[in-house]
Amino acid sequence: AVCVSLLGAANIPPQSLNLYQFKNMIECAGTRTWLAYVKYGCYCGPGGTGTPLDELDRCCQTHDHCYDNAKKFGNCIPYLKTYVYTCNKPDITCTGAKGSCGRNVCDCDRAAAICFAAAPYNLANFGIDKEKHCQ
């Protein structure tokens, strides 16, 4: 099944469509809701500094770096770029032209979703004080 599913996306502002796809991909690959990652560690969620706190936080740091690399391809804006992929729980397949902005962003999100699903989740690292723990 194609998981682009824009049927439920009609009321979502265009600028969040990629994050909506990433959310669906996270939930395809694993068993946790995407909300479990929004404020996790030093790198999950917006921004990121310091040393990752654990394996899951490293997944988010790697995802940030992957997006940084995707930005190097012309005017690729990962947070705005939508893409096409299929989800056959827990398998995710990115489609589209290899090397294109959409495919690069999809590959970043796919790798992160798989990494999130495999990494242990430490509840103590959710909602931490980033000023204190991420320098």
Curated annotation (Swiss-Prot):
Residues at the active site: 63, 109
Query: What are the required cofactors?
Result: Ca(2+)
Instruction: Give the reactions, separated by semicolons, that this protein catalyses.
Output: a 1,2-diacyl-sn-glycero-3-phosphocholine + H2O = a 1-acyl-sn-glycero-3-phosphocholine + a fatty acid + H(+)
Binding of Ca(2+): at which residues? 43, 45, 47, 64
Main localization (coarse): secreted
Enzyme Commission number:
3.1.1.4
Cellular-component GO terms for this entry: extracellular region
**Molecular function terms, GO-annotated:** calcium ion binding; calcium-dependent phospholipase A2 activity; phospholipid binding; signaling receptor binding; toxin activity
| Keyword Hydrolase set for record | yes
The record's disulfide annotation reads 28-87, 42-134, 44-60, 59-115, 66-108, 76-101, 94-106
Keywords (alphabetical) are: Calcium, Disulfide bond, Hydrolase, Lipid degradation, Lipid metabolism, Metal-binding, Neurotoxin, Presynaptic neurotoxin, Secreted, Signal, Toxin
Quote the tissue specificity entry. Expressed by the venom gland.
GO BP, sorted A to Z:
arachidonate secretion; fatty acid biosynthetic process; lipid catabolic process; phospholipid metabolic process; positive regulation of fibroblast proliferation
Note the InterPro entries from the entry.
PLipase_A2, PLipase_A2_Asp_AS, PLipase_A2_dom, PLipase_A2_dom_sf, PLipase_A2_His_AS
UniProt-listed PROSITE patterns:
PA2_ASP, PA2_HIS
Q: Which family does it belong to?
A: Belongs to the phospholipase A2 family. Group I subfamily. D49 sub-subfamily.
Q: What is this protein called?
A: Basic phospholipase A2 6
Q: What organism, scientifically named, is this protein from?
A: Bungarus fasciatus
